[in-house]
Amino acid sequence: MTATLVAKDLAGGHANRTLFSSLSFTVSPGDVIGVVGANGAGKSTLLRLLAGVDVPLGGTVSSAPDGAFIGWLPQEHERIDGETIEAYLARRTGCAAATEAMESTAEALGSGAPGADDAYAAAFEHWMASGAADLEDRAPATLAELGFTLPTETLMTALSGGQVARVALAALLLSRFDLVLLDEPTNDLDLAGLERLESFVSSLRTGVVLVSHDREFLARCVTRIVELDLAQNQVAVYDGGYDSYLEERAIARRHAREAYDEFADKKADLVSRARTQREWSSQGVRNAMKKNPDNDKLRRKASNESSEKQAQKVRQMESRIKRLDEVAEPRKEWVLQFEIAAAPRSSTVVSTLNEVSITRGEFTFGPVSAQVNAGDRIGITGPNGAGKSTLLKLLLGHLAPDSGSATLGSSVAIGEIDQARSHLDEDTALGDGFELAVPQMNPAEARTLLAKFGLKAHQAASLVRDLSPGERTRAGLALLQARGVNLLVLDEPTNHLDLPAIEQLEEALESYEGALLLVTHDRRLLDNVRLDARWHVEAGKVRLGINS
């Protein structure tokens, strides 16, 4: 079954702050609506309102038919202790809740509770529609299709980030929702996973509302865009795909700026003319008094009439100013203005691997020979679990090979953002840890730099472990700006960054002149960043290639 969702004059936010208001749109079967906006604009808040998890500050959300099976798949940064893959799939597909409801109504039916027969019939119908009846049979094949071979009894806490991403994708593929709400579904997916997700979303007959910072995914999948513009305190709905939205938004912003500039120029001109007329009027009165000391009545009358004409012109100008249609000045958006500080040049050869191999459990990486020279800009791609992070650790000297040799050059100043965002002590307040990491800055300078990256006083006082992944990433970028580096290592840097920050990162990378190792599944980032070579890692082997 499919469903239609209607948001009317919706307002959302927190008790003391409204993030958006007057938002109206309809999600019909087959629609794929992308929600975009800066971090903190209320994207996840909107999904929670559409899911019925939170109560809106204003407006309504309704579905047709009533009781439609709406699936809300939020980001989950923490895993539940003791939860198996099987239990995770049941929970994320809604099958666990449907089973619990059916068992509860069956118990009421058995005890003869009034109305239990109707409640049980509805619960049983929902249980069947959710796919709970055969989920256990369908799950292994779907997991295998995604290259996942571990048994479903495996604990989720035992999985790597890439494995968790594949299980999360499997939950989506196994779901049978009437309408789907997805919050950052592309995070941690490799290229194969992204393509499978795109295929699934594009083939759905149900409506989809999704939040994503993956520009290529948005361009390939969405049919409409809902923009939450925090800077302008506006909401807008754009028909068409993501690239069409970018063009329309650019035109709308240009027109808004032109309209304001025209209004401001016209108002300034009228104000200037009114001021001039007022000065002329005052000067005329003074001149008349000087020329007519004898108070000749006729001359005095003529002077007064002239002054009155000037005053009338002033009033006309002031009236024209009041009649102007006020045009609000477009607010300037917060811009990161991110720069990567440069260190003195390193040795000509930055890092070398010579027939390097390393084995961890059943996984063997290598043998690999590779070299990074000063100023090289290398993009590294490959499936999750292929060995990309292992390659980085060997190049940086974080891992010692079992065989072969790994050499790091002299005067290499490394700036690194790894997938774990582990650049600061987890048990230290962000502000304190940042100050320790950049001793050359005084505390005020360090806090100012954090604020520049959108990390305000309350975040600086929070423990690093309590920060969101996006906040951790911005803290890592702030460190790169504070320290001088000549070897920049970025492992999935766009995960958890919003679109404006991703664009700022691209600009910073364009002006950075040191060596760069960029691991990413972000296809637009790979296309937009200037690279000299691309290395592809798969099954522990590295294929070196020149970027075309």
Model-derived features with residue positions:
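ABC ATP-binding cassette signature C-motif
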Residues: 1-258, 341-548
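Flexible nucleotide-interacting loop at or near the entrance of a catalytic core
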Residues: 108, 115-141, 257-364
